[in-house]
């Protein structure tokens, strides 16, 4: 045996040994473990490099600092709500909110998600309307503007927004931007130069610490939040880019869901931004000052909780909320997600609901955003049809909304897709809503989307080619790590 062949054998043995040790020592889902073992076995050496970049769990080092929240009474308010609900003394605003106190309690205990009941909420399903409203609110800002977006493109929409932010920073307002280093990888730092020169501050989330190498590449901040003067906020699925206005030739019309909130729920989104900023920035840390949490009384009646989740937590708070909602369903479950790759627990919950006679409708796109992810999505959809669930293919552009509406009584809107990545790898944020009027608007939007969709029937699904079936099988196998 030549020296080169000998070294290759040694490398292969070491690859298998270290790969197995590394994968099994890290606490993770069994399906993800098997998926990584397949990659490491069939793509030796290079597969281990892929694993080091994409597969390693985050270190045990604390990512977010909770210190300072006692100044505005967050922990005290959370503890008080937990105790009052436990003692059945909490003053729920109406019978529908009270009916779902188990879900509210779960999210309180799991995530510290305080229930607020004074919110005015406006629904946006069109990018033009959402960004017109956001920019109008930014124009009226008097004290501060906080933005966090997974994608912040330097295209026409990005420039339009940036010009306003530059002007507000020059006026002396406190303006801060967080963008995800991977999601906004095509946006050059020079795009923010004038903004920073005018006094604005910008930070990338989880940037590479080494040239061309980022061992945290797989963990992305997928949140989309805007907080203006501490009393108005935006949460939902729209990123900043021309494609979100329907200007992409590939995707066409972009259908998404976003909320504008005025009420105490803004405090929770402000807290989320501060924690993310202080994690992303080594300087110019934000303290929990009264200016960021102004005293006001919301005039709305929408009860909601703001729930965050991410790889820094073992609890998968948003997914647990989804499962609790699905298990509570008696009549209808309407679900929209561009990526439908549920883990075993979520898939089982949806199947049981469908088999129990609940009208389960799942809406997915008619075109791939990511090829492997799309084929995994259609494979899971095919399996779900066997239980009587109805699958609808949105045929009026691209559906990017992440919404779950149950029984016309409760709903969730936010950034989390129905997939492994959103539940285990990404930092996400969702609003859980308990007011019937707002939930009805979301249900109406879903039913309107059905008119622009076609149903994927078992007969239609059976006609897919052998090549498509093969791609689905491979994608399904790798779905835990996509």
From Swiss-Prot:
Annotated TM spans: 4-24, 34-54
Coiled-coil region(s): none
Organism: Listeria welshimeri serovar 6b (strain ATCC 35897 / DSM 20650 / CCUG 15529 / CIP 8149 / NCTC 11857 / SLCC 5334 / V8)
Molecular function terms, GO-annotated: cardiolipin synthase activity
Entry keyword set: Cell membrane, Lipid biosynthesis, Lipid metabolism, Membrane, Phospholipid biosynthesis, Phospholipid metabolism, Repeat, Transferase, Transmembrane, Transmembrane helix
Family note: Belongs to the phospholipase D family. Cardiolipin synthase subfamily.
SUPFAM superfamilies: Phospholipase D/nuclease
Catalytic activity: 2 a 1,2-diacyl-sn-glycero-3-phospho-(1'-sn-glycerol) = a cardiolipin + glycerol
Protein name per Swiss-Prot or TrEMBL: Cardiolipin synthase
CDD domains the UniProt entry points to: PLDc_CLS_1, PLDc_CLS_2
Domain PLD phosphodiesterase span(s) in chain numbering: 217-244, 395-422
Active site as annotated: 222, 224, 229, 400, 402, 407
